Amino acid sequence: MQTHRAGPGYRRRSPVETTNVALPTGDRLQIPTGAETLRFKGYLIMSRNSSHDYADFADLVDTMAPETAAAVLAGMDRYYSCQAPGRQWMATQLVGRLADPQPSDLGDQSPGADAQAKWEEVRRRCLSVAVAMLEEAR
């Protein structure tokens, strides 16, 4: 089994997109937008390549349609650039990671039918976004 290594390093090209939320106390809180949160999760998959990042991504994607996630992630290159010369665009690399998630720490997880079933669900959600990203690119 081939294991994807963590990414070469990415640089943020633009400020973080935020929105303001009013708390019940009357205070206001500035938080990343939903799209920005999804981009953060994609960035973490590319930079750390951990099973936890894939699981968090899958949980977030479960709250939206894969096509919605794909539309956001297809524009990753406007927000992040790869620091290593000659590397593919981040969105292209992310499609590959999502299509075949192979986190660097996968062997560290406890074996068992329940853990395997959970991981297969994570893989399924990631793949659905990768396919939708390819459709978006057409």
Each language-model region and where it sits:
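Compositionally biased terminal segments of proteins
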Residues: 1-138
